[in-house]
Structure formats: structure tokens, C-alpha cells
């Protein structure tokens, strides 16, 4: 249990910050100790427990934030200039265009844009993109970590290898295994498309390789060598489940290297959701574990945009997930397995990698912690056992896989962590990306909804829309453009530079209270190639 001073000083500091910025303070005991009134917009993945939570406060909406500042006794201005805003927004952006052959792009994917905007320090989100070299297709994914970034980092490095191996034919697996045994160079199976900030752990590479090799050896033994078509859905499910199993096993076995031993335990005790797309020609598979989302942007005949959801959130808002959990455990746990819209009253996503506190037996948890390094044994969170923990596992990493056959009207796919979906409706996301890609945004009338707008306000909105053209041209990345809207949109749906500047100026200790990490990948499809596939079949 943290010492009283450890609980006291964070509380005092955040109360002081709330007075400086005019915001409500939601303290460790969940008492509102500062004005103005506070209504949470969204909740974090973990509900605090006195055993390991010293301070907790959910995010507020921007409206509550600005209202609080409006009446602050000493208002403080901290505006970033447009170049400074752009520097922050573009720091993590990455774009990839599929290369052409003989002046033609024969892939159903034109390319993709990705970007990240941190709220946590360090950011807990991760992203990955790679082209499969020994099989057809491209893999793209976003990973949302919680209780730290260790698990999301490991999954972002490893999952695509497990998927690629699961898709390989028997003869290719044999060729790779023979190359390892004879010390020859291995066939490359993935070509990564990475931002310079997207790193791989060199220290853990050998450990990860050995676990992956054990997996493909088992696949070789299971396969008789007969040429059979590989089921992509089954391959995705097997890859997700096997990686999660390896994460758990590595933590149980440990490692002689003290650094690696602590690393595998950090990975296992933290958690991550994953939303991965595999695109092969017109075949699009989305494998989702958790509450990140995949959204398809469809352009209708009249030029309007519609959003098609290709994933389901695995949380309390999904009645099928709640029912699944209740059916997997005894009836006397029906009221405790999902409590306050959380798994065992603690965890928001009902599916995730890692999070062994919701998977291992109590005896196994105690045994691993007691034999682990001091950092783990001294950590109050790892020693805390969830309440009503009777029949584990309560959590799974098994993905829900959705299949969609691409059509010419399917223009793009948005993969994003929940930091985006908490701030924007799916239809707005698709419309903004669609208008950005087609340059049609300026033709849309201004929508004011039920707001009463004066002539002066309307003039301001028209001025903003004119200025919006320049922001589109300065954004060379669709994901960056979407983040700009997610963080800077006002109540009329236009980017407000003052608001955007304020949100990006928040200090680290306040940023997480108003938004989450945001990670986005926008995949643009090649309508001509997709249409050619369709014509060939007809």
C-alpha cells in the first residue's frame, strides 16, 4: 500500500492544477473537490482500486474544459502558432504508396497514411504495417495498450509474424525450418513500412524468434504436406491466440537475463487491444480484439459518404459480449463478471492480449510474482487480485474476424484506436476523410444543427471554412487531417485553431484527462483494380 504522503501529494498537486486551469478535480476518493461541476465524457480502461490507484480522474469534454477556464480567477493564455501546431500534428505521420510496375499499380491498395497523437507519456498506442512477401496481401494494424505500453509494443512487433507464418504453405515452412537448421539465410516473410519512431526491441528479438520457430514447427507437424487452401479467418484466429499464449508462457518460464525476465513480465501484466486488417486483392479480413475499430468509407452514387463498420467493440455496450461472458462462467457469477460496465468491475475491454491478472489462477499469479524480480514483487498492482475472481480465465485474446469483399465504391478503410472514436462519430470520420481524398469538402453547406447562430457567428464560420482550404493543402496525410479535426473541431464541425492550440498545449498531467492517445491508419483502395476483379468474375 502506498504511503499516505504518496497518496496525499498527487491529490494536492492536482487540486492546485484544477484551480490554475479552472477545471474540476476528481480525486483518489472520487470526491469533487473543485468547481465547476464535472460530468465525465469517457472512462479509462481501469477503474482504480485503493490497492494500486493513487490518483484517478476521467477525461472531461472540451466544453467543460473551456467553461472551467472561462471562469478561472487567473486565466492563462498559452496559444501555439499554426506552424507549432503543424509540427506537433505531423511529428509521427507516415505515408506509403504501393509501387507501380510498368506505370501501373496492380494492387487493390494504393497506399496508406498513418499518424499518432499521444496523450499518455509515453504513448501507449502502437501501429504496424507490412507487406507479406511469401504470400499475397498487406497487413495493417493498430494496438491500444493499457497499464503501460509493454504489451502493445510486443504485440505490434510480433503479431504480423505469427499471422504470416499461419498463412504460409507447408513447403515454405519446411524451407524456412531447413534454413534455420543449416544456418542459411532465411526467406524474408514481411516487408515492414515503419516510421522512424516505430522501433523493435533488439534485446528480445532472439526470445521472440525462438517462440515463433516453435509455432511454425508445430504447424509443420500438424500439416501432412497435402496442398490445401489456407483459411485466412482461421489463420488470423490461430495467430492471435498463439501469440497471447506465448506471452503468457514466456512470463511463467522467465529468462536468465534479468532485463528480459522483467520485460516478459511487464508485457504479460500489462494489456493491449488489437485491430488488424489483411487485404489480398478484393478480399478484406478484419480481426479485432478489444475496442479499436475498422471503418469502411463507401462513396454512394450521389457522391455522399457512408460508413460501414467492419468490427465490433468488445465491451459492455456489446450485449453479445456480455452474454458470452456470462455463459462462460457459473450462474452465481452473473452479477459480478460484468460490473459497472467493466470486466469484474475493473477492465473496460472484454478481449485483450496480456492482462494475465484476468487469465491466470490466483496460485499461478502468486508463484510468478514471488519468484520474479523485486520490481514486480514490490508493485502493488501486480499483487492485487481482482474481486470475485473465482473461475479464470475471464479474458481472451481470440479475435472476432469480419470478411468483406471489396467493391469499386469502397474507397478507403480507417483503422483507429478508441481515442478517435471517443471524440468523433463514425459518419463524421468517413465524411472528413472522403472529402479530404476527393477535395470536395468546400462544396458542403455549413450545418449548424439546433444552434442559434448570429450573423457575426455565421461570418466567422464562413471565414473558418475559407481558411479550412489551406489546412487541407498543408495536410499531406489523411490521418493527420483526421487528427486535426478530432482534436480541433468546434460544435459546428469546423477546425478551430484556438481550440486546437489549447488542446495541444495541455501539460502531460492534464492531457490524459481530456483525451486518449489517438492512432489512425487510413488505407486507400484502388477502385480501378477492384473493378477489374469484379469484371473478370462476371
From Swiss-Prot:
Binding site for Mn(2+) 1: 144-145
One GO biological process term: signal transduction
Record-stated family: Belongs to the PP2C family.
Upper taxonomic lineage: Eukaryota, Metazoa, Chordata, Craniata, Vertebrata
Quaternary structure annotation from Swiss-Prot or TrEMBL: Heterodimer of a catalytic (PDP1) and a regulatory (PDPR) subunit.
Sites bearing N6-acetyllysine, chain numbering: 202
Record domain PPM-type phosphatase: where: 109-525
CDD domains attached to this UniProt entry: PP2Cc
Its job: Mitochondrial enzyme that catalyzes the dephosphorylation and concomitant reactivation of the alpha subunit of the E1 component of the pyruvate dehydrogenase complex (PDC), thereby stimulating the conversion of pyruvate into acetyl-CoA.
Keyword presence, Disulfide bond: no
Signal peptide as annotated in the record: none
Inhibition and activation profile: Magnesium-dependent and calcium-stimulated. PDP1 activity strongly depends on its Ca(2+)-dependent binding to the lipoyl domain of E2 subunit of component of the pyruvate dehydrogenase complex.
Name of the encoding gene: PDP1
PANTHER family given in the database record: [PYRUVATE DEHYDROGENASE [ACETYL-TRANSFERRING]]-PHOSPHATASE 1, MITOCHONDRIAL, PROTEIN PHOSPHATASE 2C
EC numbers: 3.1.3.43
Compartments where found: Mitochondrion
SUPFAM superfamilies: PP2C-like
The organelle targeting sequence, given as a residue range: 1-71
Protein name, per record: [Pyruvate dehydrogenase [acetyl-transferring]]-phosphatase 1, mitochondrial
Annotated cofactor note: Binds 2 Mn(2+) ions per subunit. Binds 2 Mg(2+) ions per subunit. Mn(2+) can substitute Mg2(+) for catalytic activity.
Reaction(s) this enzyme catalyzes, per UniProt: O-phospho-L-seryl-[pyruvate dehydrogenase E1 alpha subunit] + H2O = L-seryl-[pyruvate dehydrogenase E1 alpha subunit] + phosphate
Keyword terms: Acetylation, Calcium, Hydrolase, Magnesium, Metal-binding, Mitochondrion, Protein phosphatase, Transit peptide
GO cellular component: mitochondrial pyruvate dehydrogenase (lipoamide) phosphatase complex; mitochondrion; pyruvate dehydrogenase complex
Known cofactor(s): Mn(2+); Mg(2+)
